[in-house]
Every structure is written in C-alpha cells, then in structure tokens.
Regions:
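Acidic, surface-exposed loops and disordered segments
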Residues: 1-138
Length: 138
C-alpha cells in the first residue's frame, strides 16, 4: 500500500474551527465525488449527499442541530459548507453505507487541505417537522 495513502489516514483529524471563506467549487466537487464513489451494500448507492453552501440554509440546519443537541452554539463550528449524508433507513446496510460515504469524503477533503468534523444528529433533525419541511424545500 502506498505510504501517502496510509499517511493520509493517519494524519486526518477532526477540525473544530474554520475560516469563513468559501470552499473552492472544484475542491467541493471532488469531495462530493469521493462520497458518491463510496462502497455501499449491494452496490445500491442509496445514500443522498446534500452540500449546504447557502448561508440561509446553513444557519437553519445549524439551528435545528443545536436544538437537538440542547445548545445555542453552532454545532458545525463555523464551517462554510455543511455536507449531510442521508441514508435510506430501509436498506439493511444504511449505517455502514452512510459511514463509508462520510469517510471517503473526509479523506478526500484532508487530501485537498480541507478540514472536516463528523457531526451527528441528522436523523433527529429530519424526523422533526421542521427538518421534514426543510427537505421539501430542497
């Protein structure tokens, strides 16, 4: 196995402070492509990836996540992009599928010099009426 790849895995860390500048679109596209190419059970590719760059939606999703957390702080630590991975709960491998998508994207972001942090609570957000309404808007 190439040392560069192993080094990438070993040096990836969670980042909890971000610059406010936008992520270049080519870099964001590469990260999203890495998620799309992740392995999934039966090759079904059922997870949905949503990249939130619009400040209005970014604030709204942060507010919903903070409510689930019971906090009034930004659960996404000021990141200019929030990427959500929604996995089909009817698939027997939905947790594994979503996890593979997330890991691929986190490694791709690290390779491109971008920071990431895995933030939970999407299930709770989108089970709520506010979350369901937000999904309908998208």
């Amino acid at each position: 196995m190439e040392k560069n790849f192993l080094s990438l895995i070993k040096t990836r860390r969670s980042v909890r402070a971000y610059k406010s500048e936008p992520v270049p679109s080519k870099a964001l596209d590469a990260v999203l492509e890495a998620g799309t190419d992740a392995p999934t059970g039966g090759g079904h590719q059922s997870p949905t990836i949503i990249a939130i760059t619009d400040p209005k939606y970014r604030r709204e999703i942060a507010k919903l996540n903070a409510e689930v957390l019971g906090s009034n702080t930004d659960p996404y630590y000021g990141a200019p992009v929030v990427i959500l991975v929604l996995a089909d709960g009817s698939a027997s491998t939905f947790v594994e599928d979503g996890s593979c998508v997330l890991e691929n994207m986190m490694l791709a972001a690290h390779a491109l010099g971008l920071g990431t942090v895995w933030v939970h609570r999407e299930r709770e957000i989108f089970d709520s009426e506010s979350g369901k309404a937000l999904l309908r808007e998208w």
